[in-house]
Amino acid sequence: MEYKVILIQGAMNIEIEYLINQLKEKEKIAIAEYEFYKGTISNKTIIISKTLIGTINATIATSIGISRFKPDVIINQGIAGAHKKDIHIGDIVIGEKCCNINSYSMPTKSENEGTNPFEWKPDKRAKQVQNADDNLLKCVKEKLFLNYKRKVFIGTLGSGDVFNREIDRINWINNTFGNLCEDMESIGVYTTCNKYKIPCIGIRIISN
């Protein structure tokens, strides 16, 4: 399948600066607080979107991008934190699926009974795993496995408005969701794209 209009997202400048510099006939378009850079690469129309950080920003930026530019496909990419010991800095995770690691139900407790996050249970939103597009997944797998020098993993992206730094918590999340890494945007993008029926995929390079 040929994609003529491709929207590529990143939350921060460091995730999109290189891509912006590759654009020919570049045009910057600002909508609300969200920046889009339209141009061409290899005769394809490419839109680079700075989504800003977080699931809500990613959802808004994706909705704007779809409405304004009518992309054939959306690629969400950027950095992520590893959730498995065999995944290291510089490795890449391709998001075959994406899940919400920040949506829980909690047991009822009275005052002074304390709190224990390990007792929290994923709620129905967390269990609604979002899938990447099969054709995109196949294409990305072929390109990265052929050309990338570090390890490439395929699996579930964990995503939510949380920055986990506690190893026991990270291990619990990994055991609960089976995710390979965590970021703060993917779930908003996957959910929005699936609602609009726009093919999408997430690609994350491990930064920590």
Task: Annotate each predicted stretch with a short phrase.
Residues 2-63, 69:
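N-terminal short beta-loop-beta anion/metal-coordinating cradle
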Residues 12, 81, 98, 158-162, ...:
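Glycine-rich beta-alpha junction loops
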Residues 32-34, 53, 97-100, 205-208:
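Short, acidic/turn-prone active-site loops that include or flank metal/cofactor-
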Residues 46-51, 154-158, 203:
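Active-site-proximal beta-strand elements of phosphoester/diester hydrolases
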Residues 70-75:
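Proline-aspartate-enriched helix->loop->beta-strand connector
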Residues 84-177:
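Mid-sequence, gly/pro-rich, charge-dense loop/helix-turn segments that line enzyme active sites
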Residues 162-208:
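A C-terminal functional module that forms or caps the active site or interfaces directly
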